[in-house]
Amino acid sequence: MSRKHYKPLLLGLLTAAVAGVVSAQSTTPPDKDAAFRQGIPAAASKHQAGLPGGIVTLHTPGADRSGYTRTPIKHVILLIGENRTFDHVFATYTPPRGQTINNLLSEGIVNADGTPGPNVAKARQWQASQTGTYTNAPTHTSPFATLPSMNTGGAPTQAPFSSAAQAQSIEPALPSDAYEQLAEGGTGLPNKVIDTRFPTKLANAPVDMHASLSYNDYANSPVHRFFQMWQQLDCSMQSATATNPSGCRADLFPWVETTLGAGNNGAKQPANFTDQSTGEGSTAMQFLNVAKGDAPYFAELAKTYTLSDNFHQSVMGGTGANHIMLGYGNPIFYADANGNPIAPPINQIENPNSQPGTNNWWIQDGYGGGSYVNCADDTQPGVAALKGYLGSLPYRTFRGTDCKPGAYYLVNNYNPGYMGDGTPAPLGSTQFTIPPTKQDNIALLLSKHNVSWKYYGEGWGGGKENGEAGTFCNICDPFLYSTQIMTNPTLRANNQDINDLYTDIQNGTLPAVSIAKPDGILDGHPASSKLELFEGYVKKIVDMAKANPKVWNDTVIMVAMDEGGGYYDSGYVQPIDFFGDGTRIPLLVISKYSQGGRVVHTYYDHVSFDKFVEANWGLDATISPRSRDNLPNPIALRRNPYVPVNAPAIGNLMDMFDFSRGPWSAAAVQDGQQN
């Protein structure tokens, strides 16, 4: 079962004060793949120098090179929240004087008070028709006269904790004055009913949440899956312009929500199907209003440090695939014990063609259904449409979209191939777990070059994945998928918990590269969390780093989302390959070299973090020949800084810093170029 699927249930149990909740992989059902599993390496009991579980030589052991950098940055900490697009958070943000920004307010789509602006038609949403073979650009029928009503979905009726004291007894990662937030904000309504906190009639426009809810309230989560997001963005070269050369119209968000939602796992369409049957309504059109005080801490960070308004999720869709792309620079595929591609169970293969007699109700898709796609085979469902569109672009996509032959890539959320203790996870048609992978990743590249790294996953529990009442996000840890890491005790030990991060910050013992993930309570995921909780998680870490002058002097903290969560966003999307990019997401860069409230327009996605690491530590290497860190830095025109003219291209985040003093001003560390 996927984290995205079980998380609302998890919070319901927390509401009832059940502290013994377990993670998605805690139980061990009968292993139907015993024969297959015999060939998969288990965790080694002894570490041999340089040998991950005795499988592959990583490097010749040598001196730690973590301190050898091309900039004054010696430590980077990436904090990853969940499921918010750039416009969803910063729709009405006004930057400091002298800075420009691309958001709903600057585009005239909304006014600062959240009402529709003079250019609201730019965000008009349409109804469409797909009654047969999948297309990423379905035929438009008519615009919505009014948007479908909001739905409560899986948002909790009551807050997950009965008191701040109860929350603090389980959850360690908030400032002491923030625990009341976990005992407040329930909807007061049942799940999957019309959300009466919002107006009954909604204009065909982005919806200001502040007008109906407190920033402290829980709200629903929209669909955020692979083929659905391709449809929501509705990309066609017939709509391409000079400022939007990919032709992505972003005008089918509520239609996809209300016709299919998060998938059906192969089930037939329910009888008496309506625009509320998927439990979403028009959730995707909601936005927070910083001009009215929403997201106050992130707005403060943006005005103090550096904000990107052109950072994107790397993969269309959800959490698992985007964390994997961050770690590997490439999606991972279903593999045998030798790491070679093989076909997954048939019920786990995506089929986004419509069931007969339905409009966009698919044959096979869901967290307990289809999530793999063989994109090298144009006869596979959904593949020809996407490759046809990609082939029509005015530039050649990355590697010509040459998916590995016979490889079924994971494009949504499945459990990783290893438990936290290095035990292989059960496989089978009902397990929804991807086998371990031997594909290369950024951690292996760092280890090869003797650069230190850690992944701090809150709730890790020493590998038991049971901390914080079992709210550890297993699908978020890219390295739980890796044979080379999980079978090597030394490398596996780099998976740590939130208190280990606190200790390393306070003691000045941070590794060079840190990735940190909150648990499912604080990650900001709609329905199961709130953005203010992720703000609190970030604030505790930032304050701790600033309190240690040694750490603050040479550390950068980057704050990003894993993906946009299916929310509407008005920004440009650059198709790179079959898998994405997807919508914009926020990126804040916090350091003494990133001050002044700048807004950077250079084109980035998650793999830009990998490029930053490679550039800063002078690795002069990429993760693999297929990884996106091989892409060039973008070149853009001054009149349109958001669109790389050398597409596909992604930056290395160096533009997020001001290294203008001392030896760090060398052009070698710069990022994008403007002509």
Which ranges hold each PLM region?
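Gram-negative bacterial Sec-dependent N-terminal signal peptides
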Residues: S2-S23
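N-terminal pro-sequences and low-complexity stem/linker regions of secreted or lumenal proteins
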Residues: Q25-N675
